Amino acid sequence: MHFSTITAALALLGLGAATPTDYSTSSYSKNQGLAQAWTSKGRQYIGTALTIRDDPVEQGIIQSRTDFNSITPENAMKWESTEPQRNNFTFAGADAVADFADRYNKEMRCHTLVWHSQLPAWVSQGNFDNKTLISIMENHIKKVAGRYKNKCTHWDVVNEALNEDGTYRSSVFYNTIGEAFIPIAFRFAEKYAGSKTKLYYNDYNLEYGSAKALGAQRILKLVQSYGVQIDGVGLQAHLSSEATASTGGGVTPDVQTLTNVLKLYTDLGVEVAYTELDVRFTTPATDAKLKAQADAYARVVQSCINVKRCVGITVWGVSDKYSWIPGVFPTEGAALLWDENFNKKPAYSSVLKTIQSFRKS
């Protein structure tokens, strides 16, 4: 997840929302859910972020395989949750997610091993030298990835290592180890995560084809140059359907731009996925805003359809009731496929219709 705005450079792309489409209920089959439709076309998963809580409606939607056959732990596997003190591991939350995946027959996208945020102070402020920090990183990856060896279909190994201009973000890992921290992390993940697990680099604001997207391509080439396993690039896709206070004027790109960005990575031999998708706007919702949002969701889905190695799409939650966005951007939200009362929105219909409309290749 990210809390950054889209840079002014995105305006140079001249991207705007396409004319909203009327996704009438007569134009698609309501007898399928999202995951059912997606897997019937030969693709791997439609997923959602999971926080286990006492809400039987939300949890019931996630438990069913109709709409979601994959889950991503929203916070339970992050460093501050799993190793809050050095070599003192706490797995209750992460184990609960893994048990949920087993019980309800879900794929599990595990998130995330090395990230500058939600990192305990003992790591970020420890003043460790290069050798010690690498040892700490290996121990963390060994214990966390090793605990869920081959249970995770994917691991976001390194998360958000880039600035908006494509340069490396200042972090304890980069400042101490240099760019080599990235292939080193992937080497440890390759060693401990299990041969069945796909290893990903994950970041936000890649979708616009800007310098940051090229930075992620550079990371991919870097890891490959070390001869280390890297299987995919995750595009978080925290997007908007209109210009908002937080986006600096950018909106969800057109299908061709999105498709071209995905191909930046698949042309280098890896797969891609949208990993944290939501599409916000300035609230309150209106019919026009909901239609524009539906069209934006459809563009994202269509771009994934266009690229055979785009294996899946994860939305960052089920209902607007629990979305992270209003807590960070108070005038924005309504970004998910179900509203706060768990009614399916036009965006749900647009995603389902778009999936059902493409022919399996």
From Swiss-Prot:
Gene Ontology molecular function: endo-1,4-beta-xylanase activity
Keywords linked to the UniProt accession: Carbohydrate metabolism, Disulfide bond, Glycoprotein, Glycosidase, Hydrolase, Polysaccharide degradation, Secreted, Signal, Xylan degradation
Matches recorded under Pfam families: Glyco_hydro_10 (PF00331)
Active-site residues annotated for this sequence: 160, 276
PROSITE patterns cross-referenced by the UniProt entry: GH10_2
Signal peptide: 1-26
Function: Endo-1,4-beta-xylanase involved in the hydrolysis of xylan, a major structural heterogeneous polysaccharide found in plant biomass representing the second most abundant polysaccharide in the biosphere, after cellulose. Hydrolyzes birch-wood xylan, with a similar activity toward oat-spelt xylan. Also shows weak activities toward pNP-beta-D-cellobioside and pNP-beta-D-xylopyranoside, but no detectable activity toward carboxymethyl cellulose and pNP-beta-L-arabinofuranoside.-.
Family classification: Belongs to the glycosyl hydrolase 10 (cellulase F) family.
Bridged cysteine pairs (disulfide): 304-310
Sites carrying sugar chains: 88, 130
Organism domain of life: Eukaryota
Enzyme class: hydrolase
Record's protein name: Endo-1,4-beta-xylanase 2
Domain GH10, chain residue ranges per copy: 46-354
Cellular component terms (Gene Ontology): extracellular region
Pathway: Glycan degradation; xylan degradation
Catalytic activity, EC: 3.2.1.8
Intracellular or extracellular location(s): Secreted
Any GO BP: xylan catabolic process
